[in-house]
Regions:
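N-terminal Rossmann-like FAD-binding beta1-loop-alpha1 element of flavoenzymes
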Residues: 142-166
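Ferredoxin-type iron-sulfur electron-transfer modules and their immediate structural context
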Residues: 1-145
Length: 166
């Protein structure tokens, strides 16, 4: 429960600037499984989860951290995506340092915050790799009706509504 006392905060490793200049990829190396589980286990499961309170989406952060620490990643992904339509994006671009991580109870006690954003990114990258993310079909499809015989050959599309089975 109080693993944050013995396990120090670790962020994702950053790729060197020299390497990053060669290609346009992410600048951080994703957590390895053991490191993600270890960092998730640092969550103190406090009574009032200030991380969740200060998340604009009110993500159930303590619960998916606990599931990650227990290596139940598919359940962690399902819980993460139940309150967030794009958790794989939020793990990368959300300003966690000012929101969830910035209000972490163990950060305020001097032990370093739980690396919530890095763990969220790890959960969702793992979900993509394992095919847990289900593709949702759009209600709208487009079909090409014909091409105009004018310069530029503009296309005229017809839109067909596929009504959901309700």
């Amino acid at each position: 429960m109080l693993k944050f006392v013995n396990i120090s905060k670790q962020n994702e490793d950053k790729i060197s600037l020299k390497e990053r200049k060669k290609y346009f990829e992410e600048i951080y190396i994703n957590f390895a499984k053991e490191k993600a589980n270890q960092q998730a286990s640092r969550c103190s499961q406090c009574g009032v989860p200030f991380c969740q309170v200060h998340c604009p989406l009110h993500n159930n952060i303590p619960d998916w951290l606990k599931l990650t620490a227990e290596n139940r990643l598919q359940e962690a992904y399902e819980l993460s995506s139940s309150t967030n339509n794009m958790p794989e994006v939020c793990g990368r671009i959300c300003p966690q340092d000012r929101l969830c991580e910035g209000n972490c109870v163990i950060e305020n006690s001097g032990h370093g915050t739980v690396t919530i954003g890095s763990i969220e990114k790890y959960i969702n990258d793992t979900a993509w790799e394992n095919g847990w993310i289900k593709k949702e079909c759009s209600l709208w499809t487009e079909n090409l009706k014909h091409r105009q015989h004018l310069e530029g050959g503009l296309k005229i599309h017809g839109t067909v509504l596929q009504a959901p089975n309700i």
